[in-house]
Amino acid sequence: MTHWFHRNPLKATAPVSFNYYGVVTGPSASKICNDLRSSRARLLELFTDLSCNPEMMKNAADSYFSLLQGFINSLDESTQESKLRYIQNFKWTDTLQGQVPSAQQDAVFELISMGFNVALWHTKYASRLAGKENITEDEAKEVHRSLKIAAGIFKHLKESHIPKLITPAEKGRDLESRLIEAYVIQCQAEAQEVTIARAIELKHAPGLIAALAYETANFYQKADHTLSSLEPAYSAKWRKYLHLKMCFYTAYAYCYHGETLLASDKCGEAIRSLQEAEKLYAKAEALCKEYGETKGPGPTVKPSGHLFFRKLGNLVKNTLEKCQRENGFIYFQKIPTEAPQLELKANYGLVEPIPFEFPPTSAQWTPETLAAFDLTKRPKDDSTKPKPEEEVKPVKEPDIKPQKDTGCYIS
């Protein structure tokens, strides 16, 4: 599915040295600081490494997060926070407002922001894998799984960690509830697209495909609605994508619902359902053009050029013509003026996020190691704060060249 999924840019961050001169008083504390620095740098490198796979990402993320936990949680597993939580200032950009970074002197902010990027990496990995010329069944399962993992990470951040921030997220920033919720829903919707493609490939009952398409369209509508109160200057492009996907999958739902109605000898209603599918497909085509002309973060994808998109247009046209022929020869039923109400509920194939937890605190953290950080020796002019003029360079993401479109479904 090359050029099928819209992706916002990765978050960028200022370098962190983890050098605490005077504060670090022993070799074990010094080693932890060195390991934090190197594991953070390694994780940031992997975000743009095309050879990285989910196992490599998990290992690198766990390595960094388990060390970072010592800056957040107390070692005795009480509710008390670590004395080091506020020792370091972290600076991150946002996916929609990438040029203007946010900074917080809080290790929880770092945990959330880096976790957010790990989730984004999973969505980009899924998109890249889905764009392969001849995708295998195992690869399709990996696309499906990666999107569910991403949804689980976003959900966990929203429910368990963002509420712990001392400084609440500013409006329109990634950690604000509207944005992170939109990311959760989009991941679920895109994973369900894989399910729909699989159901079509295996020729499942039209009623099931219609219900899955309708549920997926509702996901996209919900995500779009979640972003509706954001500033259009940075949300318009993303919203166009969500809107066009909503129209596309509603058209799918009406198309397959029409087949179900025809099989039940309700030919007049089937024709009206397919007419609605035709109208929504045309609207999705128009929205594809508008999406391409809308400025905003992220590269522009081209869904209307994808064979999966065009195949629906042909399917709607052929099924409508078939229904009209049947009605002219056999049924002679009146065509309703109103489109049928879609009250479809899928009993199978609905996507739930894969639950996510950060790794426990690294075994390198011991009471002796923690004691080797002496905050009373911290310099008064705190050098851990980034200088005001320090620039956060955007992440240079690799260009993904679209491969030849074979029209293969993700199966």
Swiss-Prot record:
> What is the annotated quaternary arrangement, including any partners?
Monomer. Interacts with CHMP4B. Interacts with CHMP5: this interaction allows the recruitment of BROX to cellular membranes. Interacts with SYN2; this interaction promotes SYN2 ubiquitination and facilitates the relaxation of mechanical stress imposed by compressive actin fibers at the rupture site.
Free-text description of this protein's post-translational modifications in UniProt: Farnesylation is required for nuclear envelope localization.
Q: Does the keyword Lipoprotein apply?
A: yes
Q: What is this protein called?
A: BRO1 domain-containing protein BROX
Q: Gene3D superfamilies given for it?
A: alix/aip1 like domains
Q: From the UniProt record, list the coiled-coil ranges.
A: none
Q: Chief localization class?
A: nucleus
Show the CDD domains listed in the entry: BRO1_Brox_like (cd09243)
What family is it from?
Belongs to the BROX family.
Highest taxon above the source species: Eukaryota
Provide the Gene Ontology terms for cellular component. Answer: nuclear envelope; nuclear membrane
The organism's taxonomy opens as:
Eukaryota, Metazoa, Chordata, Craniata, Vertebrata
Q: Which UniProt keywords apply?
A: Acetylation, Lipoprotein, Membrane, Methylation, Nucleus, Prenylation
Q: Name all BRO1 domain ranges.
A: 90-408
Q: Where is the composition biased (Basic and acidic residues)?
A: 375-404
Task: Tell me what gene encodes this.
Answer: BROX
Residues annotated for lipidation of the kind S-farnesyl cysteine are C408
